[in-house]
Regions:
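Short acidic, glycine/serine/threonine-rich loops at helix termini
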Residues: 2-5, 89-93, 132-140, 182-189
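Glycine/charged-rich beta-loop-alpha catalytic/anionic-binding loops adjacent to active sites
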Residues: 45-49, 118-122, 128, 132-145, ...
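Hydrophobic alpha-helical scaffolding
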Residues: 53-57, 145-148, 206-208
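Alpha-helical metal-binding/catalytic segments enriched in His/Glu/Asp
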Residues: 67, 120-122, 135-179, 210
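Glycine-centered flexibility sites
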Residues: 92, 100, 124-126, 132-133, ...
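A glycine- and small/hydrophobic-rich beta-loop-beta segment
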Residues: 165-209
């Protein structure tokens, strides 16, 4: 834990800084095996970078590219479903939340070690920005809403880490990617959405999309 703490202490989000500040240079004794800590660091940094990124640049396409970059050559199967598929499969909730945004929704599925005896599923909330929709949040309530996709980022970080460590478990990750925005096409309080399981849901507050 001490070694991991040292490694994580070097994190800085400087994507928008014109001149990088001096980086911390931490040297480790070569006899210390820090591979596991490095895997953990990579996963944590992935989440931090995405959470810190402004919503202007955190588009669904950008998020998907970062997931592809993260898993790289790992034995993880990534499937990207687009809006056309979501409509065909009756994902009324995902479509409803996203329909006020100019950015189309996606649904990502990750699969690792599906033949393992012990299987786990993670579902991560991927609202890339949550204005509240027509049930608009207050200005102060929106200040941190670029972080409303932290659940999705964490789910992908976990499956990457599990694969890197070669754990003998099966893991599936499900993450919708949407923006909840107000516009003339947004869902309204009183609208009824039909979910994939056939149930209907009346929307009383468009900010209850989670």
């Amino acid at each position: 834990e001490f070694t991991l703490g040292l490694i994580l202490s070097g994190y800085k989000f400087q994507k928008y800084v014109e001149k990088d500040s001096e980086e911390k240079n931490i040297q480790f004794d070569k006899t210390i095996d820090i591979d596991e800590q490095q895997f953990i660091r990579d996963s944590i940094y992935f989440v931090r970078d995405l959470v810190n990124l402004p919503a202007l640049d955190k588009t669904p396409d950008y998020f998907i590219d970062k997931v592809k970059e993260l898993i790289g050559s790992e034995k993880i199967k990534l499937t990207v479903f687009d809006k056309k598929w979501l409509l065909k499969e009756n994902f009324g909730g995902v479509i409803g939340v996203s329909q006020g945004s100019a950015k189309e929704p996606y649904f990502l599925v990750g699969e690792y070690n599906t033949s393992a005896d012990f299987q786990i599923a993670l579902i991560g909330k991927g609202v890339l920005f949550d204005s509240g929709g027509l049930s608009l949040k207050s200005p102060s309530g929106m200040e941190t809403m670029k972080t409303d996709m932290a659940g999705a980022a964490t789910a992908w970080a976990v499956i990457k880490l599990v694969s890197s460590l070669g754990l003998n478990v099966g893991l599936k990750v499900y993450t919708p990617l949407v923006e909840n925005m107000p516009s003339s096409t947004a869902i309204r309080p009183g609208d009824v959405l039909k979910m994939r399981n056939g149930k209907t849901v009346e929307v009383l507050n468009t900010d209850a999309e989670g």
